[in-house]
């Protein structure tokens, strides 16, 4: 119901939104219904909720899983660029769950699993792609760090701890866990330390690759429900990893030089044109990746063989980083604007400020991951001062603020009122 305020001697009624309680003076538009009112902000919020529900209950294909186009459409909402990688992932995930539906029909033909390897520079969106995928298809999803894994019997995490974490994410529902997704990050850090055999065991490199082979291929893992060490008297949960989709990701620093060296061998003669690594972007070089390059990098043949789908990601340029700052549903600029909105302050970024932030991230070679730290540094003083300042309505960030040659511009309510009176 609408609220009515007489405002002292004013005989005009003030109308209020029946949902959020804001007055007609606080919103752009107030829509009247039979006995209720709704503001434009609440309408927009309702539309966002409906869109999210439509995305989460996407139209299914005949096999009961999202089609590649539907998966790609949702990825586009959250991840900027990386079109080729998104297509590869969309098809791979669709086929994986189609295979699960096919198995339940007891067909004579057994469809093999296709695990995925994501190769791309730091901060290009490998981990974020995997997280977004898990959100789309609503299955248990966990992330594991390959650098913490060691062979069984050594100090560090056992590879079976990965399955335990997945089981915990599925609330100990074994059947649901067996259809989940595991993302193993920093997989390039478990490469073989050297080509020469050594008398000492490589427990965090090749040893981890060997340990991962079985669970990636498919085995029944005995997982202690409470975690920790296994005891003979303990009851174990049996988890079949055959249908768990494994996605491995890594930056593979130095792999571009291996790929370029292979290309130089094939380009010989007076007419051959060979670009050096410095002249080409890393993402461009990664597009020529072959399994033999991964072997030279230090991955063992059996491990590479269990990752048949390889998706390469491009390094992000300034334009892509500006898009990442502003366009996705949970873009960084939108996040900070929401924080400032809690103080009833509007945060505004000029276009030159966004490009300056993107340029800094490119110079640091940190990709999208470095954008937040740059934003935090720019806004730190403002976020420190703002809660104690009165009357601030707007904070404006220009390119000079990003460069450090100026302070953010504070616009106070009184000045805005003065501008309104002048224009009137």
Swiss-Prot record:
Binding residues for ATP: 121-128
Q: Which GO terms describe its molecular function?
A: ATP binding; ATP hydrolysis activity; ATP-dependent protein folding chaperone; protein dimerization activity; unfolded protein binding; zinc ion binding
User: What does the UniProt keyword field contain?
Assistant: ATP-binding, Chaperone, Metal-binding, Nucleotide-binding, Zinc
Instruction: From the UniProt annotation, give the residues forming the signal peptide.
Output: none
Please give the Pfam families that the UniProt record associates with this protein: AAA_2, ClpB_D2-small, zf-C4_ClpX
Q: Which residues form a coiled coil?
A: none
Q: Which InterPro entries match?
A: AAA+_ATPase, ATP-dep_Clp_protease_ClpX, ATPase_AAA_core, Clp_ATPase_C, Clp_protease_ATP-bd_su_ClpX, ClpX_bact, P-loop_NTPase, Znf_CppX_C4
Task: Pinpoint the ClpX-type ZB domain residues.
Answer: 5-58
Q: Which domain of life is it from?
A: Bacteria
What's this protein's family per the entry? Belongs to the ClpX chaperone family.
Q: Function, please?
A: ATP-dependent specificity component of the Clp protease. It directs the protease to specific substrates. Can perform chaperone functions in the absence of ClpP.
Q: What is this protein called?
A: ATP-dependent Clp protease ATP-binding subunit ClpX
Q: Which gene encodes it?
A: clpX
């Amino acid at each position: 119901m609408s609220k009515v305020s007489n405002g002292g001697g004013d005989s005009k009624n003030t109308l209020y939104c029946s949902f959020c309680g804001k007055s007609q003076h606080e919103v752009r538009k107030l829509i009247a219904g039979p006995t209720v009112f709704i503001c434009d902000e609440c309408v927009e919020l309702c539309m966002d909720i409906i869109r999210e529900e439509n995305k989460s209950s996407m139209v299914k294909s005949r096999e009961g899983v999202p089609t590649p186009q539907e998966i790609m459409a949702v990825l586009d909402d959250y991840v900027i660029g990386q079109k080729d990688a998104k297509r590869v992932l969309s098809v791979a995930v669709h086929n994986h769950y189609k295979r699960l539906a096919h198995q339940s029909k007891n067909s004579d033909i057994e469809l093999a699993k296709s695990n995925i390897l994501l190769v791309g520079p730091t901060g290009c969106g490998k981990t974020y792609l995997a997280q977004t995928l898990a959100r789309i298809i609503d299955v248990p999803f966990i992330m594991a760090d390959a650098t913490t894994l060691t062979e069984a019997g050594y100090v560090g995490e056992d590879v079976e701890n990965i399955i335990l974490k997945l089981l915990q994410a599925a609330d100990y529902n074994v059947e649901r866990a067996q259809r989940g997704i595991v993302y193993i990050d920093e997989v390039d850090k478990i490469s073989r330390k050297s080509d020469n055999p050594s008398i000492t065991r490589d427990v965090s490199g090749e040893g981890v690759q060997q340990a991962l082979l079985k669970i990636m291929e498919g085995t029944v893992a005995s997982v202690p429900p409470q975690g920790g060490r296994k005891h003979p008297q303990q009851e174990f949960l049996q988890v079949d990893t055959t249908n768990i989709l494994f996605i491995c990701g890594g930056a593979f620093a130095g792999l571009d030089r291996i790929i370029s060296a292979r290309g130089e061998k094939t380009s010989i003669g007076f007419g051959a044109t060979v670009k050096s690594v410095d002249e080409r972007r890393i993402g461009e070089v990664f597009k020529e990746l072959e399994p033999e390059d991964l072997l030279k990098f230090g991955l063992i043949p059996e491990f590479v063989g269990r990752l048949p789908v390889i998706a390469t990601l491009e390094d992000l340029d300034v334009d892509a980083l500006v898009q990442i700052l502003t366009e996705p549903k949970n873009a960084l600029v939108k996040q900070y604007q929401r924080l400032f909105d809690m103080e009833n302050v509007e945060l505004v970024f000029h276009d030159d400020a966004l490009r300056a932030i993107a340029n800094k991230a490119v110079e640091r070679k940190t990709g999208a991951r470095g954008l937040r730290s740059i934003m935090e540094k720019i806004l730190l003083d403002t976020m420190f001062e703002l809660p104690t300042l009165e009357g601030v309505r707007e904070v404006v960030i220009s390119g000079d603020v990003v460069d450090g040659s100026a302070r953010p511009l504070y616009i106070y309510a009184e000045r805005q009122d003065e501008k309104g009176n002048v224009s009137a």
